[in-house]
């Protein structure tokens, strides 16, 4: 059963032996994982432990020497109960990570995500907390460390929208979006960086939006927050680079969701007309890119970058 933790009632978890990423240069037996995402050209998915075991066996047979064990990365994913966050948590869980599934209100959905990760053979903790509140963020990071000894990757995905035209926007609508979408990223990145600096390694992926690059009518608050995430992440990448901490941004465009499913035919036609590829992206598309940035040795030299995954909107 997945462990559920709320920020207001933090459950004491038994500490386990401290885990951590191997240095990239040591992971010669850990190749990029095959993804279950169609756009990666593969329909087969393997957990990290399976990949490592198979490769270690091959090396041992050829050299007669044992290959050092690669530990499962510990990942915190915020806003992971549905949509893009859910897809990211499941993708990383399938890849063999130990995943803390954060949610704000959707406890049942978050618990289901954790159960799916465990069904893949992984480990998961469900944590309820508001990432715009410093105390909740500190409790969330402590929960992951108490359970698994470290944090290797943080994916800041939690976010909200409060859409309306600028001339009608209330200050409360502005503040609410900025607090969660920008301040929440600041708090989680700051907390994660303190942990990662001590061990001189880590990866942080912040989910922004193509709206932060090109703007959108009725989303002045959202656009400002997401543009802020991009600039903030570039600065965090510069400050963390000397400690081998990679910070990158993913900027999705229109991604299929419950909201897009409810759009009328005329509105959908108008939206798709703005996308060169002529279709919505899928949450799994975003998850595949995040998995690469979070886990692949090939991403070790990438930092401070903002990747659009938008079907060509921002060309």
Swiss-Prot record:
Protein's pathway: Lipid metabolism; fatty acid biosynthesis
Complex and partners: Homotetramer.
NCBIfam families (UniProt xref): 3oxo_ACP_reduc, PRK07231.1, PRK12826.1-2
Organism for this UniProt entry: Brassica napus
Catalytic activity: a (3R)-hydroxyacyl-[ACP] + NADP(+) = a 3-oxoacyl-[ACP] + NADPH + H(+)
Residues binding NADP(+), per UniProt: 77-101
Highest taxon of the lineage: Eukaryota
Name of the protein in its database record: 3-oxoacyl-[acyl-carrier-protein] reductase 3, chloroplastic
Similarity annotation: Belongs to the short-chain dehydrogenases/reductases (SDR) family.
PROSITE patterns, A to Z: ADH_SHORT
